[in-house]
Each structure stands twice: as C-alpha cells, then as structure tokens.
C-alpha cells in the first residue's frame, strides 16, 4: 500500500490533512466527508487529526480508491478499460498467475510489533472509527486468509468485522465486556455458506474444529483487488494478485496460526472462528445505501496482533454511491464477467457496471451482423450463468450494440427508448440469485437475502427479429465536432 500511496502523492492525488474531524459514535463527520470528497472525484487523504480515535498518532487513510483512474493505478494502469482488460486476461489465464514468495519474518514490516496472549487488547491497540449512524465501529480495510479444513485449499476474501468497544446493541441488550478486548464479529455468511470463507467455516463447524483465520489490513492494493474477485474455489487469490502486479506477493508465516499473510501489511490479527458464539450486530451501512438494523454473525477471537511500528489505518464506509471503494469493488465485477463472457461469446466487447450495480454489456456487432436472432437474450442468460460470484447476482442487465457507450447512461437510455420493447425484448426471472444485502429481497438476519427477481433488457437493433432494415442514426461526425471545437477556441 505504501508504494501505491507514494505514487498517488507524486501524482498530486494524495493530500495530508491536519484539519480536525470527529470520528466518534453519534457525532462523527466522516460520512459527510466521504460524500463531499467522492462526489467531487476528490483525492486520497491522510487524516492526521481525527478526534475521538482510541489510538493516538495513527493516521487515517481516506478515499484511496475513489476514482476509476486511481483504481486502475493499483495494477499499473491509468486507463480504466486497460486495467479491466488486464484483470480479465490474467483471471482467464491461470498460467500467468505468480505464486506468492515466502520471506523471513525478521524482514517483514508487518512484524515490527508483536502482541500475543493476555497482552492482546483490541480496544486499546486497534483504531475504532465510526461513520454515520452505525452502532459499532467496523474494520473495513482487512482481508481474511483461511484454508479449507479438509483440502488445505487457500482463500483470501475482503470481509468486514464488527468491533465491540462502545458498540450499541441493535436489540437493546449489552455485549459481554470481554468482547471489546479480544473479539470481533465477522461478516462470514457461513450457514448456509454464501462465500468461500463461509464454506471453510461451515466445514470446520461440521468437523468439530475452529477455523483458523488471519486478518490482514491495509495491504498491497492488487491483493485487495484480487480478494474481491470470484476465482475458482480453492484457487489462491495471492497468486492471482501476483499475476496482476507482475511479481510475486511477499508473504510471511503467522505467529499463532498455520497461515501466511502479506509481509507488507500494516496490521495482522490472528485468531479462530467461534461458530457456537453468534452476536446480533447493527446498525451497519451497506453497499446498496441502506442501514442494516440487525445481522447475526460468528465471533472471531483474536490471540495475536502484529503491525508496523508506525502503522496506517484505512477507514471507509458504504452508503448511497459514490463512496471510497466503489470502484475497486466494481473493477473485479466487470473483469470477472468480461473474462468469462469473452471465452464463450467473442462478440462481447465490454462490460460496464454502474456504482449501483446495473450491468451493461456492449457487443461488437448489432442488427444483421448478430450471429442469430435473439442474440441479445442469449447474452443476458450468459451473464446470469457466468463463472465467478458476481454475474449471477445481476439484478438488471442491459445489452447494447457497438455504437452505444456502455459508460454513458444517456446513450444507454437512448438505446432502450429506440430499440427495446418492454414485453418482447425483456427477460424476467422470479427466482434469481440476489445481491446479499439488497433490502428489497426476501431476507433474514442470519442468511441475508436469498431470492431476487432479475430483469434483462435486449436493447440491440431488432434485425432480423422484427425488421429487415432500421432507420439511420442521426449523429454528428466526431471529426466534424473536433473541427468546430478548434474553430471556436477562445470563444467558447
């Protein structure tokens, strides 16, 4: 992460801020700050003066991934589409993945400070930052490293954790005081398992074991990007991250669990999952822009903390988009769907996903050049059947032709209004796979959303489906527009 931040600073995209901001529960200013900075496509910030923080002297990293360009920079690109194609290409070709490299613990920055056993006290040693109306503070910067308890297959996933210091109980109760010192509630959907960490947790539970986990915070952004991608089960996201960054990720063995973590992480927490201890947590601001009032999650008991001598803490929240990690969450969604579709359908040119998770698939052909009638609907079904974790959860998918910019929603709307008939050119699915936090779906506190309607819109030209010809588009030639711009230089 520090190399990435240095690149941002050199580029003028990282600012050090000494102005005080309130980070306390109930009075915090950070949701408003997030809204203000992200709505302006503002820079990354290092906040050096957050009032109410329980760990003095720890700077708070804010908004590092807040634009498409900065997210592209995490894997060495400036252009968003080039970064997406790079992600899709590496994901689709595991021969380009680079296995992680194990390094000597003595040289690992994440082990400059080691705290074990009775010395562990999360309420004193880990920053707690509140956003909006959230009841607890949440760890939002961390990846979970785990192994399949049966096969040993590795997994890295980006999950949230509830901290218990000064946390309000969503049902009006109280948490045991020791929770604040050693425990976190983990956003692991494990029963039934809706993720790889869920599978690992569920397997360990069935085997009568406690799953070992290592939670690494503020790491190489390429690893954060990889951990948000749906790679094949039991594949190593750290190797995928190596392929994305062009060199192996340096890893180091943990102190108290049989796992490896990134050697350059700012923080590492080692512990075990207690599926027999569940806690209701809330409020939590989710990525679709609503507060979850109550959710039930298992406890992770921490037995070791390691960190850099002068660590950085990354704090963010989810809310109505845009927000800080919107785009680093969207790039893997777009990349994994594009990677899968291009293997099966060469006419797929691009996949764009909006911050609100509307999918737009751009084809390289349209009209009479389409391979067969109803080709747009064929593509819609392919999105819902795509490999990875995201395509199957697409609530709204729109297919457009090559003359429609999938990133320009005005153009997408134009294609819909002039090429789409709602009854004839749509697919409605009543039993689709949901985005797990969608508040409009059937949902439970423990299982999340479990069923969603889905809609697909074929906004391609309906040749040969209904017509043999279509009116010519009335559109200015781009070269002519550029010539006019030069002609009016200094006037407009």
PLM regions: where:
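Extended, highly charged
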Residues: 1-492
């Amino acid at each position: 992460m520090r190399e990435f931040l240095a690149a941002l600073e050199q580029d003028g995209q990282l600012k050090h801020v000494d102005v005080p901001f309130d980070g306390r529960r109930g009075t915090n200013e950070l949701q408003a700050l997030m809204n203000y900075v992200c709505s302006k496509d503002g820079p990354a910030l290092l906040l050096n003066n957050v009032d109410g923080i329980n760990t003095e002297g720890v700077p708070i990293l804010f908004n590092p991934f807040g634009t498409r360009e900065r997210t592209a920079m995490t894997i060495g690109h400036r252009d968003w589409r080039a970064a997406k194609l790079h992600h899709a290409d590496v994901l689709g070709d595991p021969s380009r993945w680079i296995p992680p490299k194990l390094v000597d613990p003595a040289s690992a920055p994440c082990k400059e400070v080691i705290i074990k056993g009775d010395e562990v006290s999360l309420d004193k040693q880990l920053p707690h930052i509140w956003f909006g109306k959230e009841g607890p503070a949440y760890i939002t910067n961390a990846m979970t490293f785990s192994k399949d308890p049966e096969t040993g297959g590795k997994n890295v996933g980006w999950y949230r954790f509830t901290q218990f210091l000064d946390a309000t109980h969503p049902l009006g109760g109280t948490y045991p005081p020791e929770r604040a010192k050693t425990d976190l509630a983990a956003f692991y959907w494990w029963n039934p398992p809706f993720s790889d960490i869920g599978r690992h947790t569920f397997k360990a539970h069935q085997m009568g074991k406690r799953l070992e986990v290592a939670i690494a915070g503020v790491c190489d952004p390429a690893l954060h990007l990889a951990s948000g991608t749906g790679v094949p089960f039991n594949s190593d996201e750290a190797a995928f991250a190596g392929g994305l960054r062009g060199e192996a990720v340096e890893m180091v063995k943990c102190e108290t669990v049989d796992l490896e973590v990134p050697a350059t992480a700012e923080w590492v927490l080692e512990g075990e999952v207690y599926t027999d201890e569940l806690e209701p947590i809330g409020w939590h601001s989710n990525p679709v822009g609503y507060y979850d009032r109550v959710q039930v999650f298992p406890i992770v008991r921490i037995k070791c903390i390691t960190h850099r001598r002068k660590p950085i803490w990354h704090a963010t929240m989810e809310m109505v988009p845009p927000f800080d990690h919107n785009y680093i969450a969207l790039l893997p969604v777009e990349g994994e769907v594009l990677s899968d579709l291009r293997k099966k359908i060469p006419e797929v040119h691009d996949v764009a996903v909006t911050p609100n998770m509307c999918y737009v698939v751009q084809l390289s052909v349209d009209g009479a050049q389409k391979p067969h009638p109803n080709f747009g609907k064929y593509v819609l079904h392919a999105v819902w059947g795509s490999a990875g974790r995201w395509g199957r959860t697409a609530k709204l998918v729109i297919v457009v032709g090559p003359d429609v910019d999938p990133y320009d929603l005005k153009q997408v709307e134009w294609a819909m209004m002039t090429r789409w008939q709602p009854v004839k050119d749509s697919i409605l699915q009543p039993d689709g796979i949901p985005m797990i936090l969608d508040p409009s779906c059937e949902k439970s506190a423990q299982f999340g959303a479990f069923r969603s309607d889905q809609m697909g819109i074929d906004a391609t030209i309906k040749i040969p489906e209904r017509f043999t010809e279509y009116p010519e588009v009335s559109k200015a030639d781009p070269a002519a527009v550029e010539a006019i711009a030069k002609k009016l230089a200094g006037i407009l």
